[in-house]
């Protein structure tokens, strides 16, 4: 199974001049008519597993900068194909920067460079018009100062998600080891699974630990993988001095393949500057047209700087 390790043959998304002006200005010779081309085979995420979790990622596009000016956003398609080529009007040595991009909250219209993946930088890239210069497969990693507030990959028997008092069922590990339903990789042999049945049709669970609030404006991201035939709601339980506030963030749609999602927690938590801490909550009810449901999740991370 491949998820986020190779992404090929993307299309060029043109940006408005106003966006370029807002992010920097790249100056080039207006008389140049023949572009230089670079080809990219894909982008891999490299992690130090004990501290950063698995290397699952869903890098859907790249943000390309020349001399700190945004050139454009180049989208990877769903299917694998030949290495992609991008035209750039540049000649000679320039700084080339490639930032890995994601779909924020899983929405195609909210694409952003992921702030916790390091950009790939070539300080003096020699652009040669009329040629294709192959960069091959690129590799990114988390910034060294990224903080991992929560890591749950279900590889240990103890699970850091506890059932709510009203829940009919609990999340458990897939069995046996390397069950084909699980998210399988070099560091992943198990996943978390929630089974709903007609007589056990409601699930609720929260992270065992509470997480400290950060300075308002801090970008706090929840990463996770999922595969499900039943809707799963993700939210936060926010505790302040007097009350606990439950706030839904989004609903995960059905998917018969493993998907990766990046959820912006910070924008929601910043609405409660007096809050003390928060937990992540998971909720699901058996859909009326189903006799049973199978909800799988894995590689949960809370990350911030």
Located regions from the model:
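C-terminal motif of bacterial Sec signal peptides marking the signal peptidase cleavage site
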Residues: 21-24
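A short, solvent-exposed beta-strand micro-motif common in secreted/extracellular proteins
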Residues: 90-109
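Structured interaction patches on ligand/partner-binding surfaces of diverse proteins
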Residues: 103-137
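Extracellular carbohydrate-recognition regions
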Residues: 136-170, 294-295
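Extra-cytoplasmic beta-strand recognition segments
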Residues: 154, 207-232, 263, 300
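Short carbohydrate-recognition loop motifs
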Residues: 169-205
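Extracellular carbohydrate recognition and processing domains
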Residues: 242-275, 290-291
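Extracellular carbohydrate recognition
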Residues: 286-303
């Amino acid at each position: 199974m491949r998820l986020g390790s190779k992404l090929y043959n993307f299309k060029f998304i043109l940006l408005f001049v106003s966006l370029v002006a807002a992010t920097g200005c790249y100056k080039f010779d207006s008389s140049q008519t023949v572009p230089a081309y670079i080809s990219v085979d894909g982008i891999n995420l490299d992690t130090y597993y004990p501290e950063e979790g698995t290397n699952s990622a869903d890098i859907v596009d790249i943000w390309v900068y020349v001399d700190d000016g945004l050139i454009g956003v180049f989208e990877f398609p769903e299917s694998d194909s030949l290495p992609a080529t991008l035209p750039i009007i540049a000649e000679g040595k320039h700084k080339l920067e490639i930032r890995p991009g994601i779909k924020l909250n899983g929405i195609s219209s909210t694409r952003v460079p992921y702030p916790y993946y390091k950009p790939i930088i070539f300080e003096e890239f020699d652009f040669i018009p009329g040629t294709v210069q192959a960069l091959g497969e690129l590799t990114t990693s988390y910034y060294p100062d990224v903080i991992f507030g929560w890591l749950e990959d279900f590889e240990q028997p103890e699970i850091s998600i506890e059932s709510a008092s009203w829940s009919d069922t609990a999340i458990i590990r897939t069995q046996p080891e390397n069950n084909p339903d699980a998210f399988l990789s070099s560091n992943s042999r198990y996943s978390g699974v929630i089974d709903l049945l007609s007589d056990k049709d409601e699930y609720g669970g929260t992270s065992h630990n509470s997480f400290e609030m950060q300075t308002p404006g801090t970008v706090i991201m929840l990463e996770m993988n999922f595969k499900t035939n039943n809707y799963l709601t993700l939210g936060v339980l926010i505790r302040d001095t007097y009350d606990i506030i439950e706030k839904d963030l989004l609903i995960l749609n059905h998917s018969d393949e493993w998907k990766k999602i990046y959820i912006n927690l910070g924008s929601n938590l910043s609405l409660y500057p007096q809050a003390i801490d928060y937990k992540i909550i998971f909720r699901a009810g058996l859909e009326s047209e189903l006799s049973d449901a199978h909800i799988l999740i894995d590689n949960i991370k809370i990350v911030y700087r």
